[in-house]
């Protein structure tokens, strides 16, 4: 019952704050608000340039290997209590990630030339 009260209170508070924000806001977009701004100067070129796909690829690779650390960290903190099966699962996980990294390196996905 207590959780239901908290859930209802949270929903009512959230909807109430959104309504108050919507009713009190003064949306008046003008040319200055929607124009590009670069350190107080007018932009020299198109301010909305597209990024090269390789930047996104590097970002995705970073996220993948960052998640690897998240998955390995609990194993490293309790390594003395891990069974033989848990150790083999971790080794297989690391081997798969290493093979993936080698494939990315060989295929040219990781280069310094952007």
UniProtKB/Swiss-Prot annotation:
Subcellular location: Mitochondrion membrane
GO molecular function terms noted in the UniProt entry: NADH dehydrogenase (ubiquinone) activity
Enzyme Commission identifier(s): 7.1.1.2
One Gene Ontology term, aspect cellular component: mitochondrial membrane
Presence of the UniProt keyword Isomerase in the record: no
Membrane-protein topology: Multi-pass membrane protein
Membrane-crossing segments per the record: 4-24, 55-75, 82-102
Keywords from the named record: Electron transport, Membrane, Mitochondrion, NAD, Respiratory chain, Translocase, Transmembrane, Transmembrane helix, Transport, Ubiquinone
One Pfam family from the record: Oxidored_q4
Keyword Translocase applies: yes
EC supergroup of this enzyme: translocase
Catalytic activity: a ubiquinone + NADH + 5 H(+)(in) = a ubiquinol + NAD(+) + 4 H(+)(out)
Cysteines engaged in disulfide bonds, as pairs: none
Family listed: Belongs to the complex I subunit 3 family.
Biological role: Core subunit of the mitochondrial membrane respiratory chain NADH dehydrogenase (Complex I) that is believed to belong to the minimal assembly required for catalysis. Complex I functions in the transfer of electrons from NADH to the respiratory chain. The immediate electron acceptor for the enzyme is believed to be ubiquinone.
Protein's name according to its UniProt entry: NADH-ubiquinone oxidoreductase chain 3
GN (gene name): ND3
């Amino acid at each position: 019952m207590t959780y239901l009260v908290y859930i209802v209170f949270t929903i009512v508070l959230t909807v109430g704050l959104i309504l108050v924000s919507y009713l009190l806001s003064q949306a008046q977009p003008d040319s200055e608000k929607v124009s590009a701004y670069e350190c107080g100067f007018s932009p020299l070129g198109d301010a909305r340039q597209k990024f090269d796909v390789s930047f996104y690829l590097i970002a995705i690779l970073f996220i993948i290997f960052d998640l690897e650390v998240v998955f390995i960290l609990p194993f490293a903190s309790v390594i003395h209590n891990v069974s033989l099966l848990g150790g083999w699962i971790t080794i297989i996980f690391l081997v798969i990630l290493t093979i993936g990294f080698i494939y990315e390196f060989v295929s040219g996905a990781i280069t310094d030339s952007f």
